[in-house]
UniProtKB/Swiss-Prot annotation:
Glycosylation sites: 46, 143, 289, 299, 347, 367
Gene Ontology MF term list: serine-type carboxypeptidase activity
Biological role: Probable carboxypeptidase.
The name this protein goes by in its record: Serine carboxypeptidase-like 25
Subcellular location: Secreted
Length: 473
């Protein structure tokens, strides 16, 4: 009898300890989640938080399955919101960029030999869910090859919603948690489009998703104003000549998906003859000509890719870059390791191609892209969804001028006029708060803001979750 009481007492104490740490025993509906638990990744330092990764099927008929990686909060995860991070491209991996270069808990060592801690990881104050979408990106796959040549915004949004619904069945402890959707670049489409799918779902569901807000950075927003703002940025930052600038302005119809041959030629001339060998994602950072791990030239198929952003003319090729600036290579080495894939429960179907940071097949066959997402912004603002938009001010791909031109079309009333915000007594950037939307610049940051300015990005994220204006001192 005494032994039985002791066993009961021990069990209750164990549950109490787990609850005090913000964790709950896994049982019932979460048995499936337990199979996704990551015990440890190769070369990983010791951590106190829990990790899960695996696949969620979003379309059984075609066999479309999306890969995710959840890194729970390092302290009291049950009290923290769920933050979904999406990378753009389209066709680029949130595991390669968001998780491994920007906001995740780990960075990849040179040569892909192991991992080290990111001291500005966003999972210190949230539960981070990285999603590789659509199928064909990273470890996500489809059994119907035609999906890779026939995808776009609408299917991506619908599959992402289906993923989230199914994922919450697997992780019921997140069912009523506050949800925030974040991302950058072409995720300027993914994020608001997923938010709209959630809002529509909530109207017809008995179990609505607790979407609280979105935040996007250097985000593709509106074709016309993004393109106009991009060309203006090139000229104002002395990247192109007066002559080329005026020719682009007078020749190109920035609203069109497919530009005239004359306009395409002007874009190509500007980038090939006038830009020079720069990193377009951070015009003041060194380009990745040689990998710093001694791998020699790094312009091949497994290195930086020339990718097209759909808001730009079809012939315009953009480099997807990182900053060391060759970190993309480390990710491709690390995530192609069989021991890493096993630890992540990834590539379980033995996909017949290597894991890559970006899919050129998807990027070049993207056939459905909205010309603007500004109407969705209006819907979110009207629906009380928190909306923050930030911009690294040395990115020339989706530059700050593009974002400002696009947001100006919303004609929002100003609540707090333009002012500098501070990080460690230094100007972190500038911000303006509108009715329903906060706009923030990050000084000296490139396209991947958390990569170039991790401390400032973390402060930005912290205030976003609080729903408070950034500090004036």
């Amino acid at each position: 009898m005494a032994m039985a009481k002791l066993a009961i007492f021990t069990t209750l104490m164990a549950i109490l300890v787990m609850t005090s740490q913000g964790r709950i025993p896994t049982e019932g509906g979460e048995k499936e989640a337990e199979a996704d638990r990551i015990t440890s990744l190769p070369g990983q330092p010791n951590v106190t938080f829990e990790q899960f990764s695996g696949y969620v099927t979003v379309d059984k008929l075609s066999g479309r399955s999306l890969f995710y990686w959840l890194t729970e909060a390092s302290d009291l995860p049950l009290s923290k919101p769920l933050v979904i991070w999406l990378n753009g491209g389209p066709g680029c991996s949130s595991v390669a960029y968001g998780a491994s270069e920007e906001i995740g808990p780990f960075r990849i060592s040179k040569g892909g030999s192991g991992l080290y801690l990111n001291k500005f990881a966003w999972n210190s104050i949230s539960n981070l869910l990285f999603l590789e979408a659509p199928a064909g990106v990273g470890f996500s796959y489809t059994n119907r090859s035609s999906d890779l040549f026939n995808t776009g915004d609408r299917r991506t949004a619908k599959d992402s919603l289906q993923f989230l619904i199914q994922w919450l069945h697997r992780f019921p402890r997140y069912n009523h948690r506050e949800i925030y959707i974040t991302g950058e670049s072409y995720a300027g489409h993914y994020v608001p489009q997923l938010a709209k799918e959630i809002m529509n779902y909530n109207k017809r569901s008995k179990n609505p998703l607790n979407l609280k807000g979105i935040m996007v950075g250097n985000a593709v927003t509106d074709n016309h104003y993004d393109n106009l703002g991009t060309v203006s940025y090139w000229w104002s930052h002395a990247m192109i000549s007066d002559r080329t600038y005026h020719q682009l302005i007078s020749t190109c119809d920035f609203s069109r998906q497919k530009e005239s041959d004359e306009c395409e030629t002007l874009y190509s001339y500007a980038m090939e003859q006038e830009f020079g060998n720069i990193d377009q994602y951070n015009i003041y950072a060194p380009p990745c000509n040689k990998s710093s791990d001694g791998g020699g030239s790094y312009n091949g198929s497994s290195g930086r890719r020339s990718m097209r952003l759909p808001h730009l003319p079809h012939s315009v090729l953009r480099k997807i870059s990182g900053y060391d600036p060759c970190t993309e290579r480390y990710a491709e080495i690390y995530y192609n390791r069989p021991d890493v894939q096993k630890a992540l429960h990834a590539n379980t179907t033995k996909i017949p191609y290597k894991w890559t940071a970006c899919s050129e097949v998807l990027n070049r066959n993207w056939n459905d892209t909205d010309s603007t997402v500004l109407p969705i912004y209006r819907e979110m603002i009207a629906g009380g969804i928190r909306v923050w938009v930030f911009s690294g001010d040395v990115d020339s791909v989706v530059p700050v001028t593009a974002t400002r031109y696009s947001l100006a079309r919303l004609s929002l009333s100003t609540k707090l006029p333009w002012y500098p915000w501070y990080v460690k007594k230094q100007v972190g950037g500038w911000t303006e708060v509108y009715e329903g939307l906060t706009f923030v610049t990050v000084r000296g940051a490139g396209h991947e803001v958390p990569l170039f300015k991790p401390r400032a990005a973390f402060e930005l994220f912290k205030y976003f979750l609080r729903g408070k204006p950034l500090p004036k001192a």
